[in-house]
Amino acid sequence: MTESRSGRTVGVPRPVWGAVTATLTATVLLLAAACATPPPPGAAAAATSGEPGPSSSPSTGAPRIVPGTSAPAAPTTAPAPELPGGGRVLFPGRRLVALYGHPGTAALGVLGEQDLPGSIARATKLAASYAPLSDVPVVPTFEIIATTASSEPGGDGDYSSESTVASLRPWVDQAAAAGMYVVLDLQPGRADFLSQARRYTDLLRLPNVGLALDPEWHLDPGQKPLAQIGGVDAADINAVTAWLAGLTATTHLPQKLLVLHQFQLSMIRHEHNLDLSHPEIQLLIHMDGNGTPALKDETWAAVTASTPPGLPLGWKNFYDEDTPMLTPTQTMAHQPAPLMISYQ
């Protein structure tokens, strides 16, 4: 209502705002419907049936790709660990040249005559001296005495002193960083080889670590070190082989070396019964005799004659006990050429 010039009120209709609002709303909805993308075929049916339409996430919980983002990365598989020098099978793709001994104890071998960096440098130089004589790459190696035969029974009465994993870990880790292989040597006394091997499971889970059994220092009940040459039955070796093969397989490691030291035939009883059926394990017979070249050659002939066909062989040179110690050329002249050569 408005007021006229005469002062009288004149009836002029006001706008009907409810009707205007309804009209505008209807117009907006019609425009939105005209611009909308039609749903894909089957979407309406899916909606009425309760099944997920093409734009719904599957019931399996698969990730939904949001526009403007990348698809989830596919899971990647870590590369299989390899041996020092490459590959996952030991021989015939390499030759090992090793320093033998115990860290910090010079009396037990040349490995203990210098500190860790010095031992790496010495092993590397020694391996290099064989490179011109070898038809395969030469890998510097540590053969570390992990358990040492003792003249005293010790707290557990087994006449064997066991190194801790923590004390050996730096030698293993730094050897790996230098591209070296490591063999843990067991001198069990009255203990059994398998029980001692299990002590070093954490180290044997590493791809550059193998194992050596030294029957010379395996004692029967009532025996003491140095009173006789010890020995072990093939069945006891087979128990270690089976356990180590299982560990290697379950942790997807490359083939592991299992060294058997020998300089008398009696050191490995029933040698023909050695279990060679585990592809995860490469056995190697290591001739450990010392003395004159003629005496060592005689021992070599006896050991090689009794070794199961096809097993690789090793040779040990002694700086003090050999008279004289063979040169690399003389060492490699043996047939078959040794695939592991240790220095003590």
Sequence positions of predicted segments:
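Secretory targeting and sorting signals
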Residues: 2-39
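C-terminal region of N-terminal signal peptides and the immediate post-cleavage residues
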Residues: 30-54
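N-terminal module-boundary/linker segments of secreted carbohydrate-active enzymes
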Residues: 50-53, 58-117
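Acidic (Asp/Glu)-rich catalytic clusters
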Residues: 89-92, 124-137, 172-177, 200-208, ...
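Hydrophobic faces of well-ordered beta-strands that scaffold small-molecule active sites
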Residues: 95-101, 140-144, 182-186, 207-213, ...
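N-terminal carbohydrate-binding/catalytic regions of secreted carbohydrate-active enzymes
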Residues: 99-172
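Distinct, well-ordered alpha-helical segments
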Residues: 192-204, 268-274
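Surface-exposed substrate-engagement region within the catalytic domains
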Residues: 228-343
